[in-house]
């Protein structure tokens, strides 16, 4: 098992614009969040000024009336700024909750909608578990990213720039020291994060996705694992994948540690420069004890924000890396897309025409069909017989437009299916597969899947026509029985009859039966053949089989 390291754009250049586009869908909330949190930070920013004035007032002694007045004014300013900070911060925090939740909901819903519309080939070549992991990991990473930018980095930026300006107005040298130190620290942190941590994090995330895919693969095929007594073999397979994942994650985490150490070294030098500069100003008589207090208080606020900026930039990079695969989903081509002027198709009789159709699968040089012309009359029953790999299932997939033809066209009732919307086409074609797939939902929900909102009476009538009603009533909860993942709680014959009931209820003018009785016992086959005979009446029916019998 390998992980490809394709040359994609830096994750941060792709993810951040993606997130900002979602922010712009909630401009009001975004403004309240940013305004509240930045306002609270601005209040904190002016706190050292009043602290310095309070110290200067106290050094004059309590007997001085002007000093007492100055002390009370400074005290009042500190309290007022504290209250303002508290109210504004609460406002921002209250607004960020619905803001982030809606963004997370939109991102996950959009990703799911896009994955649902990817081509059959895409799904055949993807692990379902890996895809789920990409979406859920990216959704929760968005929570961290929102918090990091709105609650941490923006306030930090305001503190750093504001402190530099305020101190620079009094002592330009100190303002310059803070500016240079901040630029060095932030630049170094970003360089380490993007060029040192991010490449390792990208690889570890790819292996995290592999772990999810391996788990899903084994759990989905658990019946096969048990039938071969292969539990230990699957344990070993997962252990191998986890071992490689652990190696990659360990490397990433160590890089975080090395980066943190480098940040602490820069902060130590920065601290010495600022505090030393304040002492020199005091020695030179250019700063009072209150001024020194102001500088020290400002520095420790800056220090706290700078120290946290390192952590926040690391968190930003981590969340960006975790979102990268989710965002990449939106960059993948759909595969089979509706034409810009596509219209709903109206199928009445169900006459199907293959007009000089050429088709080959991607990566195959030789075409499977080369100039194929076939006509199936409305209401006609047609059998497709042949060995495995001869193109029987491909034929019906082309009718459903799960693939696009390489040449020629396919018409239904004289309408080119390439110019029809996929939803309207497939909703008028019912299919019963050799291995019917059921959702882990109730029997009633599975039968009604092709006709949402169908009444219970219609569901039961479809089940009767499919010879499924009697066995359903024998189940503990009847039509309310959950069938298990992919219908695992039902036998093969029962699943097939539920699939037939689903086709009955859909009442589509075109019917496809794909090896519907090939793997059933004689009793189940007899019941299903009776139901199939009823189902095919009055419909254009394509029946796939290995042999004529």
Residue ranges of model-derived segments:
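Transmembrane helix-loop-helix hairpins at lipid-water interfaces of multipass membrane proteins
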Residues: 30-91, 168-176, 272, 276, ...
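Membrane-integrated ABC transporters
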Residues: 1-44, 59-78, 92-96, 100, ...
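Helix-loop-helix
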Residues: 62, 166-184, 195, 255-324, ...
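Juxtamembrane helix-loop junctions of ABC transporter transmembrane domains
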Residues: 2-12, 35, 43-56, 81-128, ...
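Helix-loop junctions and hydrophobic alpha-helical segments within the transmembrane domains
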Residues: 111, 115, 225, 326, ...
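Hydrophobic patch in the ABC ATPase nucleotide-binding domain
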Residues: 120, 224, 332-335, 459, ...
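An intracellular "coupling" helix at the cytosolic face of ABC transporter transmembrane type-1 domains
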Residues: 20, 24-27, 117-124, 137-146, ...
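ABC-type nucleotide-binding domain
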Residues: 345-549
């Amino acid at each position: 098992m390998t992980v490809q390291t394709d040359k994609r754009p830096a994750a941060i250049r792709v993810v951040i614009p993606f997130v900002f586009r979602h922010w712009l869908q909630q401009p009001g909330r975004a403004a309240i969040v940013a305004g509240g949190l930045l306002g609270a930070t601005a209040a904190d920013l002016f706190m050292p000024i009043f602290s310095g004035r309070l110290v200067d007032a106290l050094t004059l002694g309590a007997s001085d009336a002007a000093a007492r007045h100055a002390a009370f004014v400074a005290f009042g300013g500190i309290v007022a700024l504290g209250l303002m900070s508290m109210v504004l911060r609460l406002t921002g925090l209250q607004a960020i909750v619905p803001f982030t939740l809606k963004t997370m909901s939109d991102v996950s819903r959009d990703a799911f909608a896009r994955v649902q519309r990817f081509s059959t080939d895409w799904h055949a070549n993807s692990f379902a578990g890996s895809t789920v992991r990409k979406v859920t990991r990216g959704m929760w990473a968005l929570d961290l990213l929102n918090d990091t930018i709105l609650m941490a980095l923006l306030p930090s930026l305001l503190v750093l720039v504001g402190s530099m300006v305020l101190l620079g107005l009094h002592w330009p040298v100190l303002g310059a020291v803070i500016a240079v130190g901040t630029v060095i620290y932030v630049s170094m942190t970003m360089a380490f994060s993007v060029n040192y941590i991010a490449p390792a994090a990208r690889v570890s995330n790819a292996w995290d996705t592999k772990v999810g895919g391996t788990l899903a693969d084994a759990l989905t095929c658990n019946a096969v694992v048990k039938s071969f007594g292969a539990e230990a073999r699957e344990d070993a397979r997962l252990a191998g994948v986890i071992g490689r994942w652990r190696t990659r994650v360990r490397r990433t985490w160590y890089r975080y540690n090395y980066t943190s150490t480098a940040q602490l070294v820069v902060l130590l030098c920065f601290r010495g420069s600022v505090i030393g500069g304040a002492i020199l100003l005091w020695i030179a008589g250019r700063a009072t004890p209150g001024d020194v207090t102001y500088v020290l208080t400002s520095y420790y606020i800056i220090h706290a924000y700078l120290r946290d900026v390192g952590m926040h930039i690391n968190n930003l990079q981590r969340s960006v890396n975790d979102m990268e695969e989710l965002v990449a989903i939106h960059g993948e081509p759909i595969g089979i897309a509706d034409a810009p002027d596509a219209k709903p198709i109206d199928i009445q009789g169900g006459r199907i025409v293959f007009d000089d159709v050429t088709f080959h699968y991607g990566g195959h040089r030789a075409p499977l069909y080369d100039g194929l012309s076939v006509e199936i009359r409305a209401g006609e029953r047609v059998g497709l017989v042949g060995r495995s790999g001869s193109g029987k299932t491909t034929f019906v997939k082309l009718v459903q437009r799960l693939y696009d033809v390489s040449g020629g066209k396919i018409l239904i009732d004289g309408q080119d299916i390439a110019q029809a919307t996929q939803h309207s086409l497939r909703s008028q074609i019912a299919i019963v597969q050799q291995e019917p797939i059921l959702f882990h939902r109730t029997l009633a929900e599975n039968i009604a899947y092709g006709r949402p909102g169908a009444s219970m009476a219609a569901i039961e009538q479809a089940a009767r026509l499919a010879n499924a009603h009697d066995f359903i009533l024998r189940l503990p909860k009847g039509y309310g029985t959950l069938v298990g993942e992919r219908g695992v709680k039902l036998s093969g014959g029962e699943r097939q009859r539920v699939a037939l009931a689903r086709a009955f209820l859909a009442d589509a003018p075109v019917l496809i039966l794909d090896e519907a009785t090939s793997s059933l016992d004689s009793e189940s086959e007899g019941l299903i053949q009776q139901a199939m005979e009823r189902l095919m009446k009055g419909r254009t029916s394509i029946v796939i089989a290995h042999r004529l019998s």
